[in-house]
Each structure stands twice: as structure tokens, then as C-alpha cells.
């Protein structure tokens, strides 16, 4: 049975959805005012995997990820660029979708935008005011945290501690310094919408509560997001939604950890931002997804050259074995080798065990690597094709592609991917493929002429360049050493 770490209880819990066989999942998406950095995409990759696994278990999943398209950052950036907030947000929603598609992730079922849900937001704020959970103050509407006795139950903080340690600006409009805005009165020159309290725009937290209520109703199964959203954003969502409906808002809270860059959290102020667009121009979507999924979603992950090298090495191992397997496959090969099929079946049980324990992707990867090791031990490039070899190749191929369908990995033709991977590395090494081909061909001629001294000299030269050469009955093959 699937167990999920619930951020609210801080424990592993058996997964039982509110409605048998169906899962309602909402994940906080980006505030769209610029190109998004690689840290912003950890959540989309993680929850894409979560959705895939839930569907593998037989659940019908409805998955929404929102766009915050009105916000202080959007307004300020739009003013800097001389654009309207709508023009700016639409531009960067389109750019996000390009990056998302480049990553080979499955589209969400819904991508609600804040500006499309103003009626829902106003309605929810009105409900909270009528229930005396919120109050109007000079055109603002503020949520009274004292009206919600369970405030702090997600983050584990209590209001006394929050007040004691808070650096909260003094605001005479607030009854309690920790009260937060549901609706903000319009400022001169800012975009605004009409409301019973005068023109204004929504506070950040009410947006998700209102969109979820409109899309899913009063309760959802899974609410996801980054750990940095636990407080105050998700804490405030609980207060708003449960204060409004009186029902438990979310059954399972899931939070992915952050990406660090050189031991520091990515931030514009530190100047260590790498956008996803920049990363994909330098590297490859498979590399990014491997970096994210080879670590458990709740662990802090480092992003940098060493992480890229580990991802390249891991992908190369799997894709090299997959390429070899596919070289033995033809449309006529339909029967898996029974002995190797047993190896893959046993490994799949380990994958399921790992994934059902809070989506344990590192252990699932370990099970996959054991299958790669077994395949490489039993099948070598250049072996003559026969039913046994082809049956092993088919069983291996099916296992890796099945694993890939859960992770949205291994989506590319294996041989073509390896060429692309080598070209990427050659570019970083300032080497041309044609130059390596020429050296390998020259070495082949020396071997054919039995000039072994020259052959060995050329091999040493090739190795010094960071290239590995393999000699098989079919000829010599080279790849960048990984």
C-alpha cells in the first residue's frame, strides 16, 4: 500500500483518497514575471512523477497547477519594462510552458490563473467577513488569525511564538500583527478589480484557496508545493479554507525540498540563478530530470557541476545498455527470455516497494541499476543475435521503458540520445566529432596493418582527450569518458 509523508502530521500515512479510486491534486505554481530558474522546476518534475505513480496504481488523478498572474513582483516588473501586468504575465506563462514542454513532462489537467478567478476570490472573502473570520480596514480585508484556533497546525508554530519572534511591520489597521491580507485596497496606478470594499486586488494566500474551492470543492486529497511555502502561504490557506467551510481542507500535504547552488539557496540577490532555458541550452532535459529524481523529493539537493556529472554518468549507463538492447530488437522479437524476465519482475517488485514508501525514487533507481548490471553481464555488443540474446534484450528494454514511463525519463531513442550526450560533452571539451572520428579511424587502420605500436600510441592519445574506445567484432566504437 502507498504511504505518503504528510507534512502536517510529520508522519508516513497510508494513502486513502477522499473518494475511492480518485485523486484531486493541486500544486502551487509559479509567479510569472521572468524566466523561471532550475529550482522552480523541481516541484513540477516531482509532482509529475507522483501523478504518474498514482495512475500506475490505478487512481484517476485530476492535477491542477496554478499561475499567479497578479502580484507585487509582476506589477513592479511590468512598470520597469513599460508593459501591462497582463502582457508581462502572459509572456512568461508562455515561456514557462515552453520550458515545461522541453522537459518532456505531461501537461497538467488544469492551469488556473488568478485573474480568471476574481469572482471566486471575492465570494470567499465575503464569506469569511460574514462569518467574522475577517474584517475590513480602510479598503483592505484582513484575516483574523485569532478566529482560527488551529492556526499553526501545519508549520508547528503557535501564535505566541510567532509574535515573540516576528519582525512584523506595525500596521494600525491590524487587530493582531499576524493578521494577513485577503484583499488589498488599490494603490494609484496599480491594476485593480471592483469589490464590496472598494477597488483592489487579492492577497496571495486567498488566491489558491479560492481556486481550489472552485475547481475541486471544499476538500482535496493532495496539496503540493515547495517547503518554503509551508509558512506562511500554506498555513494561511488552511486558515482561510477551513475557516470558510468548516471542513478539513487537505488530506495529505506534500512538500518538495529546495535546490542549492554551491551550498546556497538559489536567489537573485546572491546572483546564483540559472534559468531553465539556460540549462537546457547547455545540457539536456533528461539530465535535469535525473538530477531531481535520483534524490528523494524531501531531501535538500545540490545543483552544480558535480550533480550534472553524476546525472550524465547515470544516464550514460542506462542509455548505453538500452542502445545495445535495441540493436538486437526487430519487429519479429516478441518473446522475452524467461530467466531475464524473472530478473526484471523481481526488480520491479523492489521499484514498487520503493515508490510505495513515500515515492522513494533513489531506491527505485538502485533496483534499475541492478538490472542494468545483470544485462551488461549477460549481453555484450557484437554478440551474434539469437533468440536467447534477443529475449534478454526485449525484457531489459521493456523494463527500462516501463520505469521511464513512471519518471518521464528514458523518452528518447537510445542511440540518438548517446550521440547527443557525447556532442554536448565534446562541445564543453572544445573537441570536434570529426577530429575524434579521424583519430579512431587512423587507429583502426594501424590495427588492420598490425602496426600495434602506432595503434597503442593513438589509443593513448585518444584516451588523453577524454575518449574511451571499445573494440568489437563489428569494429571500434568510441564515446566520451563519463
Swiss-Prot record:
Gene3D superfamilies: Cysteine-tRNA ligase, C-terminal anti-codon recognition domain, HUPs. SUPFAM superfamilies: Anticodon-binding domain of a subclass of class I aminoacyl-tRNA synthetases (SSF47323), Nucleotidylyl transferase (SSF52374). It is an enzyme of class 6 (ligase). GO terms for biological process: cysteinyl-tRNA aminoacylation. A motif ('HIGH' region) lies at residues 30-40. One of its GO terms (molecular function) is zinc ion binding. Binds 1 zinc ion per subunit. Its cofactor is Zn(2+). GO terms for cellular component: cytosol. Keywords: Aminoacyl-tRNA synthetase, ATP-binding, Cytoplasm, Ligase, Metal-binding, Nucleotide-binding, Protein biosynthesis, Zinc. Zn(2+) binds at residues 28, 208, 233, 237. InterPro entries: Cys-tRNA-ligase, Cys-tRNA-synt_Ia_DALR, Cys-tRNA/MSH_ligase, CysS_C, Rossmann-like_a/b/a_fold, tRNA-synt_1_cat_dom, tRNAsynth_Ia_anticodon-bd. Its EC number is 6.1.1.16. ATP binds at residue 268. Its main location: cytoplasm. Monomer. This is Cysteine--tRNA ligase. The gene is cysS.
Amino acid at each position: 500500500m502507498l504511504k505518503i509523508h504528510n507534512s502536517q502530521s510529520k508522519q508516513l500515512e497510508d494513502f486513502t483518497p477522499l473518494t475511492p479510486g480518485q485523486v484531486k491534486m493541486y500544486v502551487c505554481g509559479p509567479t510569472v514575471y521572468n524566466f523561471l530558474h532550475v529550482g522552480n522546476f523541481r516541484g513540477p518534475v516531482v509532482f509529475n512523477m507522483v501523478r504518474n505513480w498514482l495512475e500506475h496504481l490505478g487512481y484517476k488523478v485530476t492535477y491542477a497547477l496554478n499561475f499567479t498572474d497578479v502580484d507585487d513582483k509582476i506589477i513592479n516588473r511590468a512598470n520597469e519594462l513599460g508593459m501591462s501586468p497582463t502582457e508581462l504575465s502572459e509572456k512568461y506563462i508562455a515561456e514557462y510552458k515552453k520550458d515545461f514542454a522541453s522537459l518532456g513532462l505531461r501537461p497538467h489537467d488544469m492551469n488556473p490563473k488568478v485573474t480568471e478567478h476574481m469572482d471566486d476570490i471575492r465570494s470567499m472573502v465575503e464569506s469569511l467577513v460574514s462569518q467574522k473570520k475577517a474584517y475590513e480596514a480602510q479598503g483592505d480585508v484582513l484575516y483574523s488569525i485569532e478566529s482560527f484556533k488551529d492556526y499553526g497546525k501545519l508549520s508547528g508554530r503557535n501564535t505566541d511564538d510567532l509574535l515573540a519572534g516576528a519582525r512584523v511591520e506595525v500596521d494600525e489597521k491590524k487587530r493582531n500583527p499576524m493578521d494577513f491580507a485577503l484583499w488589498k485596497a488599490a494603490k494609484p496606478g496599480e491594476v485593480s478589480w471592483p469589490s464590496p470594499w472598494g477597488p483592489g486586488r487579492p492577497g496571495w494566500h486567498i488566491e489558491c484557496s479560492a481556486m481550489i474551492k472552485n475547481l475541486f470543492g471544499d476538500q482535496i486529497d493532495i496539496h503540493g508545493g515547495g517547503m518554503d511555502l509551508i509558512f506562511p502561504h500554506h498555513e494561511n490557506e488552511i486558515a482561510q479554507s477551513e475557516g470558510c467551510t468548516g471542513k478539513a481542507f487537505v488530506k495529505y500535504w506534500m512538500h518538495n525540498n529546495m535546490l542549492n547552488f554551491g551550498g546556497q539557496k538559489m536567489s537573485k540577490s546572491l546572483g546564483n540563478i540559472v534559468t531553465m532555458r539556460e540549462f537546457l541550452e547547455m545540457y539536456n532535459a533528461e539530465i535535469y530530470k535525473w538530477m531531481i529524481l535520483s534524490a528523494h523529493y524531501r531531501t535538500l539537493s545540490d545543483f552544480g557541476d558535480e550533480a550534472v556529472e553524476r546525472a550524465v554518468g547515470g544516464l550514460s549507463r542506462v542509455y548505453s545498455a538500452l542502445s545495445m538492447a535495441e540493436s538486437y530488437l526487430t519487429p519479429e522479437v516478441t518473446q522475452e527470455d524467461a530467466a531475464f524476465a524473472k530478473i526484471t519482475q523481481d526488480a520491479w517488485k523492489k521499484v514498487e516497494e520503493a515508490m510505495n514508501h513515500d515515492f522513494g525514487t533513489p531506491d527505485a533507481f538502485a533496483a534499475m541499476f541492478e538490472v542494468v548490471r545483470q544485462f551488461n553481464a549477460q549481453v555484450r555488443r557484437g554478440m551474434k543475435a539469437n533468440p536467447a540474446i534477443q529475449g534478454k534484450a526485449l525484457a531489459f528494454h521493456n523494463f527500462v521503458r516501463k520505469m521511464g514511463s513512471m519518471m518521464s525519463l528514458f523518452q528518447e531513442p537510445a542511440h540518438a540520445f548517446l550521440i547527443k550526450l557525447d556532442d554536448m560533452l565534446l562541445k564543453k571539451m572544445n573537441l570536434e566529432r570529426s577530429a575524434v572520428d579521424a583519430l579512431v579511424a587512423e587507429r583502426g587502420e594501424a590495427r588492420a596493418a598490425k602496426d600495434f605500436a602506432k595503434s597503442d600510441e593513438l589509443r593513448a592519445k585518444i584516451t588523453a582527450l577524454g575518449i574511451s574506445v571499445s573494440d568489437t567484432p563489428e569494429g571500434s566504437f568510441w564515446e566520451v569518458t563519463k
